[in-house]
Structure formats: C-alpha cells, structure tokens
Regions:
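Conserved small/polar residues in nucleotide/adenosyl-binding loops
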Residues: 92-98
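C-terminal structural segments of small proteins and small subunits
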Residues: 75-82
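Short S/T/G/P-rich N-terminal loop/turn motif that feeds into the first structured element of a domain
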Residues: 1-53, 60-66, 70, 94
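Cationic, low-complexity basic patches in intrinsically disordered or flexible, solvent-exposed regions
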Residues: 101
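Short, mixed-charge low-complexity intrinsically disordered segments
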Residues: 86-88
Length: 102
C-alpha cells in the first residue's frame, strides 16, 4: 500500500531557507523513491485557514515514507528549515474507500 507525506504550511518566514531546505529534502525524497504529487501552487481555503504552501509526496509504501522522514538526509534538510516555517507534517497510507451497496 502506498504511503504519503503531507505537509500543510501555516507560515513561511524565510523563503531563502525554504529553497535551501527544498534542495536537500529532494535528495532524501529521491533516495526513498518518493514522487511529488503536490508542491506549492495556488490554493483556496473553503474552510479553515488558508495555507501559503502544501506538499504531498507519494512513496511506494507507508514504511518507505516513515524511513524517508526519519532518514539522516531528510533530518539534515529539516534542520535548515527549523525556525523559518510553521507546518505540521504527517504521513499516512492509502486506504481505499469501502463502497456499501445501496
């Protein structure tokens, strides 16, 4: 089952640090066979607060997403961004909806 890392930024205070982080984070994403599905772009909040940036990365499995996040490569990238962005990061697995007969 595929795994996903989801990051919805609440605030970005240093765009240069974000760019530096992105370069290093990409190395870890590629190492763990991740694929960016959403990275930035225009967004509209229909409910709740709007976000300046959203990122969704798909991995071959939940375990691979977990390994990516805990990897030395990603943690080095994460250190660059500390104090320069507020963002919850979570990882999840794909669950197919159960369709109930009518």
């Amino acid at each position: 089952m595929k795994g996903y890392v989801v990051c919805v930024y609440k605030d970005i205070t240093n765009e240069e640090k974000l760019k530096e982080y992105a370069v290093k984070a990409r190395i870890a994403v590629e190492k763990y066979k991740g694929k960016f599905l959403i990275r930035g772009g225009k967004a509209t909040a229909n409910e709740g607060e709007s976000s300046p940036r959203t990122v969704v990365i798909e991995f071959p499995s939940y375990d691979e997403a977990n390994l990516f996040y805990k990897s030395k490569e990603y943690q080095e990238a994460h250190e660059i961004l500390k104090g320069h962005a507020i963002r919850p990061v979570s990882y999840t697995h794909l669950t197919l909806p159960t369709i109930q007969p009518v």
